[in-house]
């Protein structure tokens, strides 16, 4: 039909008649001309992309003339000699001929995945913590996008590392070969602890857009549609950009991208030094950057033969008489001798290519470029813009596009020859620690990696939940601990703080916590012995069910015990070693005897609770380390449990001690002296008001602060109160809420460490199995020193902490670390830890098995005002409260000193919309 119309149109035109309904022109033709003019000849970006479709089940991505696969990996943190050797062998022996392996790292400003996980875990704490969550998220997202202030040390990033592989599409055989190598690659990455994750088509859409069409605004997560071409889904419409000589201008976002290639390489380099290309400890690259490094096994037998031939000719030429004095020829020959020797020992001839993309706002791109070049120059790399080939260079950085664009890169001299051992040193797989995969306290690495720290997460599954904080006055210790406390409360962890100095007053009041001040007006009574007799009742019931082989889920349902405690009961009943039972097992003791009325009673108590009580009473009686004395006290505890049951207290224990008889019916030698030592803590004693029976304290708030300022000059009493509180809390969770986790923070522990070391050691060894975390905070490492040989418990407390947090140190503090065999290797890093002079952040070295990193604690204005321990801020808040403002209103007023807070309503609404997408 259309052909007939076309012929009639030509005929009409030949006869001088008008066409197209007598209008004399073709509307479609005119429209296309106008469109060409409107768009200035622009073509859809997707037309330049080669992706066709992705198969998520197999992980294969099909493109025009090529196929590929890819993984996201965890970065290497720190130096690792073995991985260099292993990857060298892998590249030499396993990289298929015709294969292209790309290592890609994206220093993204998009930290939403990290913040989503962080926010998702924060389900408790009420309105105040919800408000803090919203302010903190807005603050961190602002830091991640604020390239102009990158030099303040708070530019947050999310480094994402990928390994991609591409090869020619040879049909079914090609796919089979790809899948075979994909399996080998996955196994190798996993063997090197790089935690490979097979990427999907959704990942490709997201990363492809981030490379080609970066946006500073929050984007919805893409969803791959199998019915449509993959390239069309990567490139968004109506996102115009202009390719210029030395940059790509993104008109909608106002951003500019530049691609660079190394013009000169350092003479020597190692894998551990690649971290320096991500930024320095004190200077960030003020823009989003991407590093793409590709190795290609594409020379074939002919190419390898040509390489060897070139080397042989160079060596022979250097032996000629006319080149004996030619230093250049001699040096070239020497290098060829070395290269041929390495090749003979198994290293392969490969090709390599490296590209770096930098993206920043148009008005800031020149500064960002200068910082990038300066950073690379410092490390003996010289970068040059890929002038006139920005389009090809940017497309060649896309995942799995290296096979397709290699010839173009080679034509423009962006490839080099290299040996398989040489390329490993340039792999961009170094990075910063990504933290734990659970919500916790937020930190920013020195090079920007945003991460969570949660003491309840055990790396590798080993260790406990304890942590040590070492920081002198003024280093930001109390500030950091308040951040840890609020992070735990938001996860339904009950937090108890033993404080000296009222540092936690604001956060306690704001979060509706309980502040208990030990002074002459204090009417609280602590009696951990009241629940001692029943400490093992529920556990014994669970143990009987375990012996009946009842399922753990049913045991949990009937007893309320956590799976962790049920497992601990199994270990306690097993034939495990004494050391394993102490740290991981719960053992139940049966105590049987006559009560006051002569009735036979049986009590089931935990072994740990008896040991806690013995350690506490030993401190009161001054017999720590005295085997006989501690044995007498243990006997008194057992008899007290039998005689008084849940009515047991210190006054009654004193009576039991005074009445102890030996096998001959005579008074036990020394027992009466111990009873006298307990007198100050009885009903009639000076400190009896703290320990009387009847008013059994129960701490139900999510945050409880024990303010011990007025006891700090009586260190023995302070040590006793500390131990009683710790035992009381543990017994509460042992006999009451048996599924909730709890954290005990002992601030300024250096004051009482020598008086309560034995108790704290035992507590540190055992609290994990009851769901508890112990945080001990001191001013320097000497608090845990055992150089004299008599402070084994103090040293053990340090050893029993899986996590160590170290803040900025004084000269004396550094001397202690330098003298420690355990910390000598970390001395340079510890010495570099600093608190920002402008109070924008405090650095914390986080040390555990498998990770030693530095994180920067940077908080929003609201949190800063809430956590502040500055005298002027305390006075300001008190004045505002006297004026009638609530604590929240006073903190809002103080926050203006530290920054501007956004209106929460639109933030929360936007977050809700994004979460619903």
Model-derived segments and spans:
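Charge-patterned, long linear interaction tracts outside catalytic cores
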Residues: 440-449, 456-472, 484, 625-658, ...
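Short, flexible loop/turn elements at secondary-structure junctions
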Residues: 75-77, 107, 165-169, 360, ...
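Extended, folded cores of ATP/NTP-driven motor/assembly subunits in large transport
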Residues: 1-429
């Amino acid at each position: 039909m259309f052909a007939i119309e076309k012929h009639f149109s030509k005929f009409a035109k030949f006869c001088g008649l008008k066409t197209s309904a007598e209008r004399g022109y073709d509307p479609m033709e005119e429209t296309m001309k106008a469109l060409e003019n409107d768009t200035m000849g622009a073509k859809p970006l997707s037309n330049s992309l080669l992706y066709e479709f992705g198969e998520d089940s197999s992980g294969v991505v099909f493109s025009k003339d090529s196929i590929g696969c890819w993984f996201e990996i965890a970065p290497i943190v720190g130096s690792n000699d073995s991985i260099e050797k292993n990857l060298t062998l892998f590249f030499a022996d396993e990289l298929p001929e015709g294969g292209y392996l790309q290592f890609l790292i994206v220093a993204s400003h998009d930290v939403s995945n990290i913040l989503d996980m962080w926010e998702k875990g924060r389900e408790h704490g009420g309105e105040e913590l919800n408000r803090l969550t919203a302010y903190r998220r807005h603050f961190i997202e602002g830091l991640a996008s604020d390239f102009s202030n990158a030099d303040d040390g708070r530019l947050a990033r999310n480094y994402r590392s990928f390994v991609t592989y591409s090869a020619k599409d040879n049909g079914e055989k090609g796919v089979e070969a790809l899948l075979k190598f994909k399996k080998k690659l996955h196994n190798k990455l996993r063997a090197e602890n790089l935690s490979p994750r097979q990427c999907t088509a959704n990942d490709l859409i997201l990363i492809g857009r981030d490379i080609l069409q970066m946006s500073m605004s929050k984007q919805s997560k893409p969803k791959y549609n199998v019915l449509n071409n993959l390239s069309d889904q990567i490139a968004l419409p109506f996102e115009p950009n202009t390719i210029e000589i030395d940059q790509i201008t993104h008109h909608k976002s106002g951003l500019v991208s530049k691609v660079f290639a190394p013009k000169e390489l350092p003479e020597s380099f190692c894998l551990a030094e690649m971290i320096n290309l991500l930024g320095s400890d004190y200077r960030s690259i003020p823009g989003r950057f991407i590093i793409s490094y590709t190795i290609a096994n594409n020379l074939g037998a002919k190419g390898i033969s040509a390489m060897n031939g070139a080397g042989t000719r160079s060596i022979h030429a250097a032996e000629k008489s006319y080149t004996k004095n030619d230093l250049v020829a001699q040096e070239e020959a020497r290098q060829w001798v070395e290269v041929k020797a390495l090749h003979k020992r198994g290293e392969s001839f490969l090709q390599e290519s490296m590209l770096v993309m930098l993206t920043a706002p148009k008005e800031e791109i020149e500064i960002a470029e200068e910082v990038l070049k300066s950073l690379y120059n410092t490390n003996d790399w010289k970068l040059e813009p890929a002038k006139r080939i920005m389009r090809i260079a940017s497309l060649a950085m896309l995942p799995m596009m290296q096979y397709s664009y290699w010839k173009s890169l080679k034509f423009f001299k962006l490839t080099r020859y290299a040996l398989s051992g040489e390329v490993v040193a340039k792999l961009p797989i170094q990075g910063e620690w990504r933290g734990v995969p659970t919500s916790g306290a937020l930190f920013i690495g020195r090079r920007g990696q945003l991460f969570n720290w949660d003491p309840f997460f055990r790396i590798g599954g080993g260790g406990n939940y304890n942590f040590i904080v070492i920081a002198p006055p003024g280093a930001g210790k109390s500030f950091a601990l308040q951040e840890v406390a609020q992070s735990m409360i938001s996860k339904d962890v009950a937090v108890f703080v033993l404080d000296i100095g009222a540092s936690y007053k604001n956060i306690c009041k704001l979060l509706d916590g309980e502040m208990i001040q030990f002074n002459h007006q204090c009417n609280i009574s602590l009696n951990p012995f009241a629940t001692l007799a029943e400490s093992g009742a529920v556990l014994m019931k669970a143990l009987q069910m375990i012996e009946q082989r009842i399922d753990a889920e049913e045991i949990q349902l009937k007893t309320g015990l956590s799976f962790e405690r049920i497992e601990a009961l199994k270990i306690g009943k097993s034939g495990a070693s004494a050391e394993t039972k102490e740290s991981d097992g719960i053992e139940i003791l049966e105590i049987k005897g006559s009560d006051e009325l002569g009735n036979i009673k049986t009590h089931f108590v935990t072994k740990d609770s008896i040991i806690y009580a013995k350690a506490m009473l030993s401190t009161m009686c001054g017999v720590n380390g005295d085997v006989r004395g501690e044995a007498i006290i243990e006997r008194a505890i057992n008899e007290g449990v039998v005689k008084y049951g849940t009515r047991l207290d210190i006054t009654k224990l004193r009576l039991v001690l005074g009445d102890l008889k030996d096998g001959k019916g005579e008074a036990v030698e020394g027992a009466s002296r111990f009873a006298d030592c307990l007198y100050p803590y009885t009903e009639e004693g000076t400190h009896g008001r703290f320990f009387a029976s009847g008013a059994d304290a129960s701490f139900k708030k999510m945050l409880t602060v024990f303010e011990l300022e007025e006891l700090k000059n009586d260190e023995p009493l302070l040590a006793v109160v500390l131990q009683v509180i710790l035992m009381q809390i543990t017994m509460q969770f042992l006999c009451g809420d048996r599924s909730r986790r709890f954290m005990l923070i002992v601030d300024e522990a250096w004051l009482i460490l020598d008086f309560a070391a034995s108790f704290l050691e035992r507590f540190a060894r055992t609290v994990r199995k009851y769901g508890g975390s112990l945080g001990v905070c001191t001013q320097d490492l000497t608090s845990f020193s055992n150089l004299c040989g008599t402070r084994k418990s103090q040293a053990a407390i340090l050893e029993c902490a899986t996590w160590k947090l170290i803040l900025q140190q004084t000269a004396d503090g550094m001397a202690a670390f330098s003298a420690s065999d355990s910390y000598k290797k970390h001395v340079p890093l510890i010495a570099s830890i600093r608190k920002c002079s402008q109070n924008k952040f405090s650095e914390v070295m986080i040390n555990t098995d498998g990770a030693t990193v530095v994180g920067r604690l940077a908080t929003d204005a609201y949190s800063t005002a809430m956590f502040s321990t500055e005298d002027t801020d305390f006075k300001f808040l008190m004045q505002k409260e006297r004026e009638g403002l609530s604590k929240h209103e006073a903190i809002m007023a103080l926050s203006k000193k530290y920054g501007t807070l956004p209106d929460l309503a639109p933030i929360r609404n936007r977050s809700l919309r994004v979460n619903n997408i």
